[in-house]
A protein has these predicted regions:
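Stable alpha-helical elements in mature extracytoplasmic
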Residues: 58-66
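Acidic/histidine-rich, surface-exposed loop or edge segments in extracytoplasmic proteins
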Residues: 38-52
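N-terminal accessory/precursor segments of enzymes
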Residues: 29-39
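An acidic-aromatic pocket/loop used at catalytic or ligand-binding sites
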Residues: 1-30, 55, 68-195
Length: 195
């Protein structure tokens, strides 16, 4: 996770603001007495990170640089790493969204753009678009809940600038989320249930 965040940090036009790391282990949900969806695991552990960046300049200048950094193949692609035309989750779609003002030629709203790859997602402020998005401040670190055995939450740097202050400085905030389904950090440690 740190390596990918560092690679994104080297993209011209992005300034790292903060990263929130979460590591937790829990007993899987096995449903109610009326459901038969017993997990094959007794314990699962997963990590997630959300890195916040200030965008210097226009996001449409930065998106091609993110693609050129080869952090992931963003969205569906055809041969030789070319984005599938009109496919969501790609840099090409995101650039078209901004160029067209978030509307199809017939006036319909386009779906909001993000960059997506297995276990990775990039999103950003789109404050003046038909489907606005505003990156929020990171949520407070949650306490250990029932079913959760362990949770560690940390922020780097220890005393970061707020997202609101970063937005005032840079104009646009971008988030890079790592973890979840498709990530090597999802269920990175499991304890199988004995049969």
């Amino acid at each position: 996770m740190r390596t990918l965040i560092e690679r994104l940090s080297t993209v011209e036009g992005l300034e790292h603001v903060l990263t929130r790391f979460t590591d937790s282990c829990a007993r899987p949900y096995n449903g109610s007495i009326f459901e038969n969806n017993r997990s094959p695991y007794h314990l699962t552990c997963s990590m997630q990170a959300v890195a916040y960046f200030g965008v210097r300049g226009d996001i449409t200048d930065v998106l091609p640089r993110i693609r050129a950094a080869h952090i992931a193949n963003w969205g569906p692609q055809v041969s030789e790493g070319v984005d599938l035309p009109h496919a969501g989750g790609t840099v090409t779609y995101a650039l078209t969204y901004h160029r067209e003002g978030g509307r199809c030629p017939d006036g319909r709203l386009m779906s909001a753009p993000t960059l997506e790859a297995p276990g990775l997602r990039i999103d950003w402020d789109r404050l003046h678009m038909p489907l606005p998005n505003r990156v929020e401040e990171p949520a407070a670190c949650l306490p250990v809940e029932s079913g959760c055995i362990y949770r560690r939450c940390s922020t780097v740097p220890d005393a970061p600038m707020s997202v609101a202050a970063a937005r005032t400085r840079y104009g646009t905030i971008l988030t890079f989320t790592l973890g979840g389904w498709g990530s090597t950090a999802y269920h990175y440690f499991t304890v199988p249930r004995r049969k």
